[in-house]
A protein has these predicted regions:
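Conserved beta-strand positions in the central sheet of alpha/beta enzyme cores
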Residues: 78, 97-99, 136, 174, ...
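Short, acidic/turn-prone active-site loops that include or flank metal/cofactor-
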Residues: 56, 99-106, 247-248
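Active-site-adjacent beta->alpha loops and helix N-cap segments on the catalytic face
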Residues: 85-89
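Active-site acidic/histidine proton-transfer and metal-coordination neighborhood
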Residues: 12-22, 42-44, 106-214, 224
């Protein structure tokens, strides 16, 4: 029997309908609009270990957010005060990343080294005592008197002061790359941030040469600054220690207002063998914040 284009399209449509009929839901897409989001979604596949960056859902109380995460099926939280860690653990959630120094005052400037070393050391000890595995670090902002090569050397010098302890305690220090292009909001972009080129961040990590220093690959920031996200995930898979998400442009929901194909990105991450956490770090704009988180969780539950 001769098969034409119309027959093929009809067969594909029938297959899609049958899939929806028997699974009860359509496959999640990054371009699903708010009015099509599933208000009852719970994570089913769980191949991506999803977490949430707590500050993005302010002013929602931390424990209210934690209970929502548990109900949806997220398995961890980060970016919250350590005073909540015991309650988070009682809910059965992990802490996927522990804070240290801020992104503005980083090791680019030697004047910040003592403070960075102190805060990173405290966070490593906290992780080791509580059974957590990752601590965040940043480069800090550029300084006019410091050229790029000197800035790189300064960062390396500072990190090498704390990495022996991290290695001993089996803790991973995660360097976050941030975009410097978006100046529309203080947390959507960070003009002046030194580590704004993901390739440069990887160069610094490789020059340090420690398995306890990895890249925090923020998909949103990489898309803004460098693009070619999936190729870079594959290229840098051996140095990636953590992931963040958000829609671009706007650092908002993973919906039809943004350009990143998150199901494709999540599948690419899985194909690299990565088994760590992917933290949702979008700033919700929908009136229903819980629905926004459910939607993002569904998009990433590939």
């Amino acid at each position: 029997m001769k098969t034409n284009r119309r027959t093929l399209l009809k067969t594909a449509a029938t297959t899609a309908f049958a899939t929806t009929l028997f699974t009860g839901s359509k496959p999640a897409r990054a371009q699903t609009p708010m009015n099509n989001a599933n208000p009852k979604f719970r994570i089913r596949n769980g191949r991506i270990k999803q977490s949430i960056m707590g500050w993005t859902f302010n002013p929602m109380p931390t424990l209210e957010l934690a209970k929502l995460c548990k109900e949806i099926g997220l398995v961890a939280m980060e970016g919250i005060s350590p005073k909540f860690y015991p309650k988070i653990r009682e809910l059965g959630l992990d802490i996927s990343l522990v804070g240290s120094h801020g992104f503005k005052k980083g090791p680019v400037d030697p004047a910040n080294h003592d403070e960075c070393v102190e805060k990173i050391t405290q966070s490593i000890e906290l992780c080791a005592s509580a059974g957590y595995k990752r601590v965040i670090t940043f480069t800090g902002m550029k300084a006019e008197r410091i050229d790029d090569e000197e800035a790189i050397k300064n960062c390396i010098t500072c990190w090498k002061k704390v990495l022996p302890l991290a290695e001993k305690k089996k803790i991973t220090l995660c360097l976050e790359h941030l975009n410097s292009r978006d100046d529309s909001h203080p947390m959507k972009g960070h003009p002046g941030y030194f580590g704004d080129d993901v390739d440069r961040c990887v160069e610094m990590i490789n020059r340090v040469g420690s398995s306890s220093l990895k890249l925090l690959f923020d998909v949103y920031h990489v898309q803004v600054m460098n693009g070619d996200v999936i190729r870079r995930i594959n290229q840098y898979k051996d140095v990636i220690g953590h992931y963040h998400t958000a829609g671009n442009p706007g650092r908002a929901e993973l919906d039809d207002t943004q350009e990143i194909n998150y199901p494709g990105v999540m599948n690419a991450i899985l194909k690299t063998g990565y088994d760590g956490y992917v933290a949702q770090e979008f700033i919700p704009t929908w009136d229903d914040k819980a629905l926004a988180l459910r939607h993002a969780a569904e998009v990433c539950d590939v």
